[in-house]
Amino acid sequence: MQLAGVWENEHGSIMEITVQDGKIEGSYSSYTGDKGAYRVLGLADPEPIGGSQTFAFAVSWRPLDAHDAGSGDHWVSGFVGQLQVIDGEETLTTMWLLTKPTTPEENWTSILIDKSIFKRRDRG
């Protein structure tokens, strides 16, 4: 079981990450909302036990190849979850928060929360 690799979630978004000494780096390609490739940075348990590896990573929704800032370019998401083998498949089970800038009067609209399940894509 290894966190590094290529992962696909239920929406068809692709995340490609490397992990070195517990540090996660990579890219997240979204196919919902604003399309593009985005930076991923995070941390993982460097010595997982018990068939589960915990991790957390952030995605900055400013496209890696952006020249002009769009409205989503100021959004950031934080994902937390575990890598486990579920029904014979390596699976990332995550919960995420997305925050976007608002006025103080609209702060209640600034954070969204949901779950996302990723399956390994780079192993047949």
Give residue ranges: language-model regions:
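Central antiparallel beta-sheet cores of small beta-barrel/beta-sandwich binding domains
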Residues: 1-87, 114-116, 120
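Edge beta-strand at a domain terminus
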Residues: 44, 91-124
